[in-house]
């Protein structure tokens, strides 16, 4: 495994300071690569200079300097942790990344499982025993330097990769390609350079520095005019198969209905987790699935009964908070269930990957984000960023929040507009014959209908 590093130099007069920053990055990157390090510099005229060495850069710091000059344009570098399956007892310069072809210079983090197949397909030979060394000959043979055509070649790779690529014919630009292996970008305005590396920690950036995580499964080109172009490696679908985590309440029901009305293929996923309203929610979701004419999957779990520490679970010692006619329960997470949405999302993600769904969705919304951290839009955004590292290679599962930016009365309004089966929903934390009318969800529901001047179609206890 490796850390990949690249630099696009915009102001060559600052080459000495740029070199110092590069050296610091490579030393910090030792935790992803201790066995060797290499630097290849592409000059303004397309010629190259290189420095490759066995061992840690921190123990040979002098070899990190004296490489750049006023004509340097692009730097491609690598720190390598030699995989057990590719251990080379006596390494030569040919076994050290970056690898240099006739036109392209490549540094690679990951494993290419089909390197021998690529040799046959493109009729090339590896530059070394290392799998990564197949890439420069493949690119030399089949790539014209156009961003769009690069994605087609990369999709023939079976394995993992983060690539930083330099083009000797066009030393005014740098390319970054990745599936699930990470690459970060930092623009140093003062130095006049754009830096790339595998972890943002290696930049030693401050809060005011411009650091960006590049999207997984993308190919990016940055040129010396600071133009950035990006193309995805995975195709986007207009009509999606979506697995909706459905409780039977207002929010997830409106979310599911909205997706159905958008033309997507929706399946409802419901969890029976020994909560007090389990039977009523289960009944509601079944009726909602019939109304929307969509499949319904349910999962029974004892996990939250084992975790405990929530008044929402059957047999708990506490009671549902009903102070101030339910307003107290609406404004604070008294009925918090530890890590519930994280677990629900994780199970939904596993099922989505296994059964070929394109996305998962839920009824997470702005109203309940005021009390519950795992209803915050940021929770969904952060989980979405985690997904490429939680599913298999070349799998894409989106995380959607159709009502994420709406408050409760807006959700009710939208539900009426799209003919969502609000009359079939169950919002109450209790599992009685009717809504209790006094818990937090009941309070929010009643107020939401009142704001819209509508009669709530469900019944409440007197």
UniProtKB/Swiss-Prot annotation:
Pfam families: GATase_7 (PF13537), QueC (PF06508)
Keywords in alphabetical order: ATP-binding, Glutamine amidotransferase, Ligase, Metal-binding, Nucleotide-binding, Zinc
Residue sites binding ATP per the record: 246-256
EC identifiers of the protein: 6.3.4.20
Catalytic activity entry: 7-carboxy-7-deazaguanine + NH4(+) + ATP = 7-cyano-7-deazaguanine + ADP + phosphate + H2O + H(+)
InterPro entries documented for this protein: GATase_2_dom, Ntn_hydrolases_N, QueC, Rossmann-like_a/b/a_fold
Name under which the protein is recorded: 7-cyano-7-deazaguanine synthase
């Amino acid at each position: 495994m490796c850390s990949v590093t690249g630099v696009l130099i915009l102001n060559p007069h600052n080459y000495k300071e740029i070199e110092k920053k590069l050296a610091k990055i490579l030393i910090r990157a030792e935790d992803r690569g201790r066995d060797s390090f290499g630097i290849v510099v592409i000059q303004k005229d397309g010629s190259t200079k290189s420095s490759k060495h066995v061992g840690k850069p921190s123990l040979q710091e002098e070899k990190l300097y004296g490489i750049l000059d006023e004509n340097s344009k692009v730097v491609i570098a690598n720190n390598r942790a030699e995989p057990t399956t590719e251990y080379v007892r006596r390494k030569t310069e040919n076994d050290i990344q970056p690898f240099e072809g006739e036109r392209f210079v490549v540094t690679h983090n990951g494993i290419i499982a089909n390197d021998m197949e690529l040799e046959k397909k493109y009729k090339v030979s590896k530059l070394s025993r290392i799998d990564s060394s197949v890439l420069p000959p493949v690119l030399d043979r089949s790539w014209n330097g156009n961003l769009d055509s690069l994605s087609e070649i990369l999709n023939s790779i079976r394995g993992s990769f983060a690539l930083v690529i330099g083009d000797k014919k066009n030393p005014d630009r740098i390319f970054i390609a990745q599936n699930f292996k990470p690459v970060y970008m930092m623009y140093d305005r003062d130095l006049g350079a754009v830096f790339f590396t595998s972890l943002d920690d290696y930049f030693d950036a401050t809060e005011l520095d411009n650091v960006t995580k590049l999207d997984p499964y993308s190919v990016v080109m940055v040129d010396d005019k600071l133009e950035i172009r990006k193309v995805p490696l995975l195709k986007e679908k207009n009509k999606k198969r979506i697995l909706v985590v459905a409780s039977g309440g207002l929010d997830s029901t409106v979310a599911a209905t909205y997706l159905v009305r958008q033309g997507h293929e929706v399946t409802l996923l419901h969890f029976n987790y020994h909560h007090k309203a389990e039977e009523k929610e289960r009944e509601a979701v079944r009726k909602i699935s019939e109304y929307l004419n969509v499949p319904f999957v349910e999962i029974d779990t004892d996990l939250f009964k084992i975790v405990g520490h929530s008044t929402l679970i059957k047999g708990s010692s506490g009671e549902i908070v009903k102070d101030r006619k339910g307003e107290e329960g609406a404004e604070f997470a008294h009925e918090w269930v530890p890590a519930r949405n994280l677990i629900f999302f994780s199970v939904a993600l596993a099922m989505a990957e296994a059964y070929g769904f394109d996305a998962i969705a839920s009824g997470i919304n702005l109203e309940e984000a005021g009390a519950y951290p795992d209803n915050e839009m940021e929770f969904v955004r952060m989980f979405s960023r985690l997904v490429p590292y939680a599913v298999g290679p070349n799998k894409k599962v989106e995380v959607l929040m159709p009502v994420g930016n709406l408050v409760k009365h807006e959700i009710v309004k939208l539900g009426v507009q799209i003919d969502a089966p609000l009359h079939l929903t169950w919002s109450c934390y209790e599992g009685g014959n009717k809504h209790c009318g006094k818990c937090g969800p009941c309070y929010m529901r009643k107020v939401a209908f009142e704001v819209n001047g509508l009669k709530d179609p469900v019944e409440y206890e007197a």
